[in-house]
Amino acid sequence: MLSNPSELVTRNIEQLENQRVMLINIEADELGHHLTRHCSEVAALALDFNHFQAQPSGKSGFRCEFGHQWSRDEKFDVVVVYFPKAKALAPYLFALAAWHLRPDGTLLITGENKGGIRSVDKLLGNAFSPACKIDNARHCLLYSATLVAEATKPNAEDWVSRYRLSLPSGDIQICNMVGVFSDKQLDQGTALLLDNLPKLEGRVLDFGCGAGVIAIALMQQNPGLQLECVDINAMALLSCELSLKANGMEAKVYASDGLAQTDGLFNAIVSNPPFHDGLSSTTDIATRFVADSYKQLHKGGNWQIVANRHLPYSDTIAKVFGEVNTVAENNKYKVYANKKR
């Protein structure tokens, strides 16, 4: 199966025939494998861990990595960029593309009409010729541009916004990579969670760590924690690492699909889970998170999250933990706190 933006690429396969091709911000489909039948080589960079896991392994002529950058300084004839949902991330992806293109190489940009791709020319930068629209189908657009200037390798730290936050435990510095949501102030949900954290010790998991606000607060309030921070977004993981470093703290930061890549039991799991839209698919993921959390807590371990009050957590929490314990709430959020019996 192919996503609509990928279908648009295959409609223009002559652009890629017998070329060395790199895909940046790849989606969870089979385009990479499909292109091996037409291209001399295909490499793919996934910024979403779920998209990385969806790629076929062991396919001849296809390599895929997860992260914020490709691990090798390779050059390609064509780079295909999937226009990101977070438009602020686009210039960074185009800078990556410029670095990995040979002189006069071709950049293809594919994405949904509603995703902001029409503003591509304003975001391309000076390394490329003006973008030319070459196809329009399946509610998506495909643009092409040519590398016209020598590019330097993007330094990730040049794409960070740094700002200070005041927490109940003290002031901290946050390092936020482009494309990672932040309004440069403590959001109401996280603030409510941090105001109601118990004293913690031992091995603790920050699920959906984002830029590391909760992680740093946990370390401030509980020195000596064995803290682990997980997310599916490569830019969020880098943000968390940089934020911890900026505050003189250390934690294990890694990608995980839900809790699947975590190992062993935790004394506590704390989260502002990234499940906010109330869609059935999102609710299913949230339900699984509650059940998986229970399995990975020590007996007596703490489980504490903040969630939009309209999301249907209560029934699942009651079923899994045996009761629902709401320790704080306002007109938008609830903080749930339970122990494993």
From Swiss-Prot:
Xref: Pfam families: MTS, MTS_N
One MF annotation (Gene Ontology) recorded for this entry: nucleic acid binding
One term under GO cellular component: cytoplasm
Leading EC class: transferase
Sequence similarity: Belongs to the methyltransferase superfamily. RsmC family.
Predominant subcellular localization, coarse grouping: cytoplasm
Protein name listed in UniProt: Ribosomal RNA small subunit methyltransferase C
